[in-house]
C-alpha cells in the first residue's frame, strides 16, 4: 500500500517513532535508513511524512522530516511553541548560572521562555522578588508557584494552554 500521510512524532523509543496522524490515530514507524546515513535523527515534535505499510496494524515508515521551526538537544525535541524552565525558589537554592544557560540555549533557538519559581511559600515576597525581578526586567515572564499550597497553578496552566511546551529544570524543584 503506497499511502502517504503527514503527522507529528509524539514519542520515540529504541528506534521506533510514534506518529500522530490527525483523524487516523497513532502509527508505529521506523525511520528510513537514509536519515541514519545523513546523521539526521527524528525528534519528538517533528512533522513528518509517513508511508503507511499496514493500515490495520497502524504501521509505517517515516519517509520525510519536514523543516523544523526549532530543535533542542536536551530534551531532544523539535517544533515547540515555548519552554518552561522550573527552578525552586529555595531548598535547593536556585543555581542562577544554570538558569542563565537554559535561557541562552532557548534564545539561541528562538524559543520563548517562561520561568517558574516553585516553592515560593518558603520565601517572603521581598526575598523572592530580589532575584526574580532581574529576569522580569529582561523581558522573561515569571510565574510563582507553590505545589504544596497549590498557589500559582492556574497562572501556570494559563501560560501552557494550547501550546507545545518543553519543560526543563534541575531535580528537586518540586
Predicted feature residues:
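Conserved catalytic network of the ASCE P-loop NTPase/AAA+ motor domain
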Residues: 75-78, 107-109, 159
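Canonical P-loop GTPase G-domain recognition
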Residues: 121-173
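Short, well-ordered coil/turn elements that cap or connect secondary structure elements
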Residues: 24, 57, 108, 137-139
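Residues at alpha-helix caps and immediate loop-helix transition turns in enzyme cores, especially N-
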Residues: 95-98, 127-128
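N-terminal accessory targeting/assembly segments
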Residues: 1-96
Amino acid at each position: 500500500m503506497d499511502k502517504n500521510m503527514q503527522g507529528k512524532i509524539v514519542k520515540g523509543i529504541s528506534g521506533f517513532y510514534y506518529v500522530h496522524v490527525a483523524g487516523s490515530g497513532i502509527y508505529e514507524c521506523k525511520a528510513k535508513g537514509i536519515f541514519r546515513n545523513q546523521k539526521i535523527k527524528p525528534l519528538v515534535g517533528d512533522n513528518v511524512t509517513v508511508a503507511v505499510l499496514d493500515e490495520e496494524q497502524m504501521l509505517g515508515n517515516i519517509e520525510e522530516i519536514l523543516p523544523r521551526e526549532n530543535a533542542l538537544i536536551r530534551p531532544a525535541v523539535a517544533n515547540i511553541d515555548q519552554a518552561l524552565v522550573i527552578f525552586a525558589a529555595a531548598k535547593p537554592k536556585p543555581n542562577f548560572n544554570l538558569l542563565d544557560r537554559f535561557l541562552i540555549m532557548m534564545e539561541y533557538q528562538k524559543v520563548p521562555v517562561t520561568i517558574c519559581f516553585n516553592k515560593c511559600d518558603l520565601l517572603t515576597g521581598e526575598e523572592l522578588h530580589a532575584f526574580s525581578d532581574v529576569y522580569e526586567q529582561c523581558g522573561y515572564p515569571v510565574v510563582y508557584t507553590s505545589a504544596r499550597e497549590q498557589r500559582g497553578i492556574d497562572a501556570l496552566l494559563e501560560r501552557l494552554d494550547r501550546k507545545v511546551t518543553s519543560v526543563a529544570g534541575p531535580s528537586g524543584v518540586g
